[in-house]
Amino acid sequence: MSWNHNRRWKDFQALVNAEDYFAFFELPYDPRVVNVNRLHILRKFAQYLAPLEHFQGSEEEWLEQARQALEKAYQTFLTSTPQQEKLFRVFQDYGCPDPVGGCAGCSSSGERGECSPGIPA
C-alpha cells in the first residue's frame, strides 16, 4: 500500500464528501473534474464498493480495495460522461430522438446523439 497505513474503518465511515474521500485515500484529483462530476463519481464508487459488502479480508485490505474503487470511479469520469454512464434516472432515458440526424439539442451541445431530454427534434 502506498498510502497512510494509519487509516481505519471508523475514519472511513465519518467521511462526508468527495474531497474527504480523496484526502483520506491520499489520491490526487483535479478539482474541476470533481466539481462537475462529484455525485456521479460517488455513485460509481458506491457501485464498486458493493461487492466488498461481504469482504473477508482484513480492514487494511478492505480499505485498499476501497481506495482502488475510488480511483477507478474517478478515472471513469476522465474519459466518460454522466450521460454515457447513466448512473442516475435522469440519464437512463437520455438520448437523442434522432440519433442519426441529430436534433436541436445535439446541434446546440455539439455532441450529436447526446442531447438533453425534452428538446424537440
UniProtKB/Swiss-Prot annotation:
Species for this entry: Synechococcus sp. (strain JA-2-3B'a(2-13))
Gene Ontology BP terms: nitrogen fixation
Family membership noted in the UniProt record: Belongs to the NifW family.
Pfam families: NifW
Coiled coil (residue ranges): none
Full protein name: Nitrogenase-stabilizing/protective protein NifW
Subunit note: Homotrimer; associates with NifD.
Transmembrane portions of the chain: none
Alphabetical UniProt keywords: Nitrogen fixation
Function statement: May protect the nitrogenase Fe-Mo protein from oxidative damage.
